[in-house]
């Protein structure tokens, strides 16, 4: 375990050094800010595997990366507190854990529905939404998706499930409990396409021969830091933290480290 911790800290050292430099120009967090952001004294970061926006394995050693993962460690370094990763199967479970106060931080789509359950800092990254299909799928273009008989997979409890459920007039949604199961359902032709952000879609496609991400998009995700409701005292600090990460170029470095594709520009 200690070896793994040393490897992780080594991989994140450039991030921590940049954060330390940024912190020199940012006021130190006061007691109220720390109480809001890390009430237990440890920053509990909620992640789920398979999405570069959350957590993926990168490099020959398979070290952990991803925006929620790396931003969480960067924030912990800025605050001067330890970080604990809390892993879930899918994003909906991360949001539920935030609502319950079981985790303190994640990075995810700041949708209108989620904003009713958690608080968001300003948007840091915009990401295109699209579809993944297998060779031989009856869906060859986005215009083919919402037709009778088409089965479109989504992550169970995701924003995509809610948005497409309202938009579709003909296609049927097929919820998948995890990204691994979504891959299997695509391979077994239990769905004709899978819908989510392109960061996830390209990751899935890399692991699935004879699959491709359709050209075009059906929308955008606005990705932002999320914290539990009732901790708004910490939001001004998160605003400055995000601004510093973007201005220093470190946010873009994290995007590249995670291998995140499909971005539509940062704000």
Q: Predicted regions span which residues?
A:
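Bacterial N-terminal signal peptides that target proteins for export
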Residues: 1-12
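Alpha-to-beta junction loops
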Residues: 81-82, 99-108, 150-151, 187-200, ...
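C-terminal motif of bacterial Sec signal peptides marking the signal peptidase cleavage site
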Residues: 18-21
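Periplasmic-binding protein-like
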Residues: 49-50, 125-136, 198, 202-243, ...
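Extracytoplasmic small-molecule ligand-binding "clamshell" domains
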Residues: 26-109, 257
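Extended ligand-binding regions for polar small-molecule ligands
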Residues: 23-28, 66-78, 137, 143-151, ...
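Bilobed "Venus flytrap"/periplasmic-binding protein-like clamshell domains
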Residues: 47-52, 61-78, 132-184, 198-200, ...
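Acidic, polar ligand-binding/catalytic clefts
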Residues: 69, 73, 77, 82-146, ...
């Amino acid at each position: 375990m200690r070896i793994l911790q040393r490897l992780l800290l080594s991989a994140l050292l450039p991030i921590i050094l940049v954060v330390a430099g940024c912190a020199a120009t940012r006021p130190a967090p006061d007691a109220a800010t720390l109480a809001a952001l890390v009430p237990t004294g440890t920053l509990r970061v909620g992640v789920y595997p398979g999405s570069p926006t959350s957590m993926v394995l990168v490099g020959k050693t398979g070290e952990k990366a991803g925006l929620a993962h790396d931003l969480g460690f960067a924030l912990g370094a800025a605050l001067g507190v330890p970080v604990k990763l809390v892993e879930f199967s899918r994003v909906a479970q991360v949001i539920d854990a935030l609502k319950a106060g079981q985790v303190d931080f994640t990075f995810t789509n700041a949708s209108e529905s989620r904003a009713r359950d958690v608080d968001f800092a300003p948007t840091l990254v915009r990401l295109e939404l699209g579809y993944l299909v297998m060779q031989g799928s009856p869906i060859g273009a986005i215009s083919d998706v919402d037709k009778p008989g088409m089965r479109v997979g989504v992550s169970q409890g995701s924003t995509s499930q809610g948005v497409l459920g309202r938009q579709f007039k003909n296609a049927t949604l097929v919820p998948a409990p995890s990204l691994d199961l979504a891959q299997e359902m695509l391979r077994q032709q239990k769905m004709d396409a899978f819908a989510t952000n392109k960061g996830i879609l390209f990751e899935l496609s890399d692991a699935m021969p004879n699959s491709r991400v359709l050209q075009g998009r059906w929308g955008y995700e606005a990705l932002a830091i999320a914290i539990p409701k009732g901790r708004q005292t910490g939001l001004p600090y998160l605003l400055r933290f995000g601004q510093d990460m973007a201005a220093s170029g470190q946010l873009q470095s994290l995007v590249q480290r995670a291998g995140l594709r499909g971005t539509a520009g940062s704000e």
